[in-house]
Amino acid sequence: MPKTDIARRVYNHTWKLDPIVRSLLDTDFYKLLMLQMIWQLYPDVDATFSLINRTKTVRLADEIDEQELRDQLDHARGLRFTKKEMIWLAGNSFYGRTQIFSPEFLAWLARFRLPEYELSRRDGQFELTFRGRWAETTMWEIPALAIINELRSRAAMKGLGPFTLDVLYARAKAKMWSKVEQLREHPNLRISDFGTRRRHSFLWQRWCVEALKEGIGSSFTGSSNVLLAMDNDLEAVGTNAHELPMVAAALTRNDRELAAAPYKVLQDWNQLYGGNLLIVLPDAFGTAAFLRDAPDWVADWTGFRPDSAPPIEGGEKIIAWWKKMGRDPREKLLIFSDGLDVDTIIRTYCHFEGRVRMSFGWGTNLTNDFAGCAPTEINGLNPISIVCKVSEANGRPAVKLSDNPRKATGDPAEVERYLKFFGSEDFVEQSVRV
């Protein structure tokens, strides 16, 4: 692939619209895996997704031009999966499996387009909402976040000249490469790119992926970004996300169904997938509650992804649970992915080395770390904690608790009800930077 002069490309914005999302494959792989399950098992469920900016000090509607945002969202709505992309999805192997996507699902996907959106401004923030069938609205999460983050980056750099931009990206590349050199010192460490949602830009994410591929070779196990995986001959990586138990819980009619919801979606998942895709995400309503009530068969799954507890603390709890359930942790897999940077990755790897198999999903601190790179400080280049979460399912409020109370989402009264039901054991409040 020819190399792009990112600084020159950023400066040369002379066209009417420079699309941020140019392909529906510019999304995370787990969205496609979940989409097939939703399409097959929940075709009539409505789900509303809402933008949430957890960094309240950043007034997005003051930094990003609303018309530019609308133009980018409208462009994304005009995209379809191309013939080349459909052939790749049908013929490629994922996690050692061919034809992981059924012909019927792919036929539906070939006609897919993103549904309409609702956009307004309130108190310096955008209110961005997607309503409709779950199998349609779910696909807005990643492109919406990528669009907002890149528009914010563009706005922050708008006044910079070509020389300053060149310095900015040269420093960012040097900073990134120094992280690669640290990772090289641990050749058995396995790491993948999880940085699509809050990336600085698509071109920058592509450069980071190329740097990891060049710099650490086989230790780089792939990218969650499907388009980058296809274009760079990498593994597309990812399993499932919080929206599955969130929607399942919102649809329940009584306490018995609510208690069973986190495990029901795992059984649904197991109908379609197996092997290395059997990864448990335990923290939607608190990891302690999940482990306390988990059926024995959960311990037979390949691994866990502890996503909101401190990585060492969260990993230790899961290892202790495996031992309690009579399983050997050395045969299991832990995937760490929450707010990691190279120091945290190496520290966690060294702590657990030899005790459990590990993989690391490196996100925002891979694809959006420009701190100290600009000649003068530019606040708009600092990453923010922004998410697009399911807020309703069939008109009922959806809730996420997580192991970090600051990451909880949902109607406050409903959050309180879930806390009383599941408990808040072992919750640890931590600042949320990304």
From Swiss-Prot:
KW Ligase (keyword) present: yes
Enzyme Commission code: 6.3.4.21
Gene Ontology biological process terms in this record: NAD biosynthetic process via the salvage pathway
TM annotation in the entry: none
InterPro entries: N/Namide_PRibTrfase, NAPRTase_N, Nic_PRibTrfase, Nic_PRibTrfase-Fam, Nicotinate_pribotase-like_C
Post-translational modification as stated in the protein's UniProt record: Transiently phosphorylated on a His residue during the reaction cycle. Phosphorylation strongly increases the affinity for substrates and increases the rate of nicotinate D-ribonucleotide production. Dephosphorylation regenerates the low-affinity form of the enzyme, leading to product release.
Modification sites for Phosphohistidine: 242
Gene Ontology cellular component list: cytosol
Superkingdom of the source species: Bacteria
Molecular function via GO: nicotinate phosphoribosyltransferase activity
Catalytic activity: nicotinate + 5-phospho-alpha-D-ribose 1-diphosphate + ATP + H2O = nicotinate beta-D-ribonucleotide + ADP + phosphate + diphosphate
Cysteine-cysteine disulfides: none
Pfam annotation, one family: NAPRTase_N
Presence of the UniProt keyword Ion transport in the record: no
Pathway(s) annotated for this protein in UniProt: Cofactor biosynthesis; NAD(+) biosynthesis; nicotinate D-ribonucleotide from nicotinate: step 1/1
Keywords attached to this entry: Ligase, Phosphoprotein, Pyridine nucleotide biosynthesis
Similarity annotation: Belongs to the NAPRTase family.
Function: Catalyzes the synthesis of beta-nicotinate D-ribonucleotide from nicotinate and 5-phospho-D-ribose 1-phosphate at the expense of ATP.
Protein name: Nicotinate phosphoribosyltransferase
Protein's organism: Rhizobium meliloti (strain 1021) (Ensifer meliloti)
